[in-house]
Amino acid sequence: MFTVENHSGNCLVLIKLFGGKMYQSYGGSVGGNLKHIVIATKYRYKMMRSPTVKTYCRVAIEEACKRHGIKIEILKVMEDHVHMIVDCPRTMCDAKLIQLIKGLSSWILFRVCENLRKRYPNGNFWNAGYFCTGVGTDFDRTFAYIENQEMHHATQ
């Protein structure tokens, strides 16, 4: 068990459970809010085939998460979609989480890669849909699945 003091002076206890994953304790409750998220480009265009766009996409998602207190456990940017596991604040619902990540990352991408406007003149980089589920105790299996995405897509 580890004890850390957070920025507001409250005592935050971190407890190791299930495969070494750290869970947070706030007062009388213990838990985490790990989410496996998949978001795809609009029309599944392979926009991240370009190494430049792929790098900017990674940086834009990292910045969006940092600004909103969302911790990225793993992030894999594929040619037409992104897989990630994030640990978000426990009060944040899935729809808000996706809105923050897709909205700010899209806004950043259109400013640093101006040529994206040729493909997406309406300013929608991401598809309207998404996949988001709680990871729970399957963290190691989900992490390995995301880690092996290049190999998974190479065999298809």
Report residues per predicted region.
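Charge-rich, low-complexity N-terminal segments
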Residues: M1-Q156
